[in-house]
Amino acid sequence: MLADLPIALNPHEPTSIPTQLTEQIRRLVARGILTPGDPLPSSRSLSTQLGVSRGSVVTAYDQLAGEGYLSTARGSGTTINPDLHLLKPVEIEKKETSRSVPPPLLNLSPGVPDTATLADSAWRAAWREACAKPPTHSPEQGLLRLRIEIADHLRQMRGLMVEPEQIIVTAGAREGLSLLLRTMDAPARIGVESPGYPSLRRIPQVLGHETIDVPTDESGLVPRALPHDLNALLVTPSHQYPYGGSLPADRRTALVAWAEANDALLIEDDFDSELRYVGMPLPPLRALAPDRTILLGTFSSVITPQVACGYLIAPTPQARVLATLRGILGQPVGAITQHALASYLASGALRRRTQRLRRLYRHRRSIVQDTLGDLPNTQLRPINGGLHAVLLCDKPQDLVVTTLASRGLNVTALSHYWGGTGADNGIVFGFGSHDEDTLRWVLAEISDAVSLG
């Protein structure tokens, strides 16, 4: 057995940790570094070596065993399948390079949470239970136990009453939106906020729908400016992206009235709703119009995006249509992951974790405000919730982004979030995933980069 498998995982890639691990073990086999009969580390040992959850390793091992790469036997551990037929190992040509590869940038992507304290006893216990008693079947809508726990979680955390049969388990907001849009006749006219989340803007276009930019201000969507010929409207009422406005009650009422008058579907992205630092969050839009609203939810901000699990809530008739389509396309979230999340939710650990994260992020938010709040020639937009900040500046945003990249920091130009012209000048950066010392260093670099001096 190799003392340490030559594997390097990147938690900030869009590909999940189990998928990265699966691909890299396949590659080691293809290159002849791992050969038939070679023993592999136990899931516990490899998870410790790589600094990932044991559940991620178990999921990867299960996938590889199903593909015939691995063999597992009680008492003898996990090995590369002795009967695996291999092609000649691929020799990878080593090319000389005239310059060194630049080091990876420190990830300041918006929405990345702090996972340093995630792997506590409740999290480990949930994955142990899921791996010890893996489900044998996952319904199209997702495990009933998980849907029951999601319904209870929403009742306690968001004051929302839903039934398990109205819930579809998804691989996150983007996947849930994609599933929903596949049930709509193309080309539908889909209203999207401008500025808004770029990938949620692109998904309708990829599926053959037309996107129509709708304006926002410091409070979010502006209902009076909505056109009357939209089939659906994608809206973030709890935490508008990226500016963070929360849609006030009068606008919510006006939005529901607009939807009813125009027979339009409201697609509510409940992004960052549980991470609010000022006042109490308003109930979801779905509470006002349950028969006209589809709610997209995810656990990425309070657990980790690498879990790749979320939910979609629809009126019962539409939920049946979505479940039928899900049965055709397949359930993208593994049953073991669903079982582990159900156990984690049932233990109450996620509610306790969310409370701890609010305190942690509120402190980091204060550091951002204290450092950047009074910088000359800039304006720090209010941070009422979420894991990112928006800093308007007089210095050209592309120059700021380039300067910070040269110092090993990746921030996003504010214009990235606009569908067309009229973008404000500034940057967007996440502050949730790094410790206090790192955050203070990052903010000092940002302060210097936006300076006109």
Curated annotation (Swiss-Prot):
- Name the needed cofactors: pyridoxal 5'-phosphate
* DNA-binding stretch(es), residue numbering of this chain: 43-62
- Which InterPro entries does the entry link to? HTH_trans_reg/aminotransferase, PyrdxlP-dep_Trfase, PyrdxlP-dep_Trfase_major, Tscrpt_reg_HTH_GntR, WH-like_DNA-bd_sf, WH_DNA-bd_sf
The answer to whether the entry has keyword DNA-binding is yes
Residue ranges of domain HTH gntR-type in the record:
15-83
State the UniProt keywords alphabetically. Aminotransferase, DNA-binding, Pyridoxal phosphate, Transcription, Transcription regulation, Transferase
Task: Provide an example Pfam family for this protein.
Answer: GntR
Any one GO MF annotation of this record: transaminase activity
Its biological function?
May have a regulatory function in pyridoxine biosynthesis. Is said to also have an aminotransferase activity in valine biosynthesis as a double inactivation of ilvE and pdxR results in an auxotrophic requirement for valine.
What family is this protein classified in? In the C-terminal section; belongs to the class-I pyridoxal-phosphate-dependent aminotransferase family.
Name of the protein in its database record: HTH-type pyridoxine biosynthesis transcriptional regulator PdxR
Which source organism does the UniProt entry give? Corynebacterium glutamicum (strain ATCC 13032 / DSM 20300 / JCM 1318 / BCRC 11384 / CCUG 27702 / LMG 3730 / NBRC 12168 / NCIMB 10025 / NRRL B-2784 / 534)
Q: What is the lineage of its organism?
A: Bacteria, Bacillati, Actinomycetota, Actinomycetes, Mycobacteriales
Q: Per UniProt, what is the name of the gene that codes for the protein in this document?
A: pdxR
